[in-house]
Amino acid sequence: MSKVGTKDLYTPSGIAYIDDYVFSKEYPWELLGGIKAYIQSLIEKGMPGFDKIQPDVLIGQNTTIAKTATIIGPTIIGNNVEVRPGAYIRGAVIVGDESVVGNSSELKNAILMRHCQCPHYNYVGDSILGNFAHTGAGSILSNLKSDNKPVVIHNEGENIETGIRKIGSFLADHADIGCGSVLNPGTIIGQNTQVYPLTMCRGVYPSDSIVKGTKEIVKKR
């Protein structure tokens, strides 16, 4: 059974305001309900070195925001971030330093740690992306079951009842999601694991693996 604790999936980003929150809970899904309030508290206190481009949107230094991008607060975007044309940030979002949010990518109630890339046509809702995580073009982190029931995380025979209706995915550090893949609600991708294009993922995938298909997982050499 794979370990799914916050400290099992993520390492410190070196960005204090992100690390303080991410490592405040034992499990990553426990973070989702407090993201909005945490961002609001940071904005109210003020963050040195950040510019306020809207009453509830802060951006860091050397960050570029395309004119056609849409950003709804509360949102904090770090340093050296690129938000490209057509990006849609729906609020309750933290985008860590050196990250990319690309054309037609939509983020909602999510944290991207350091150097994350969601560059083309991605949906990232109610999710946490670790350092250097990458979502290939058209990959979707689905956050709502078709029956609207609370999300259950399936971990090698153990079913973890979260009691939460909306959960996307938790991508650990250096997780790489192939183009056109769909991650079902509650999917966890371990550190340094690669998902092949057009794969449907459900459950927990171990670190240092290659996911070639829904039921084909091999250890990296």
What are these regions (language model features)?
Residues 1-56, 61, 192, 198, ...:
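Terminal amphipathic alpha-helical/low-complexity segments used for targeting or macromolecular assembly
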Residues 18-19, 103, 112-114, 119-221:
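Glycine-rich hexapeptide-repeat left-handed beta-helix
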Residues 58, 76, 94, 170, ...:
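ABC ATPase A-loop
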Residues 61, 65-104:
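Glycine-rich active-site/cofactor-binding loop and its immediate structural neighborhood
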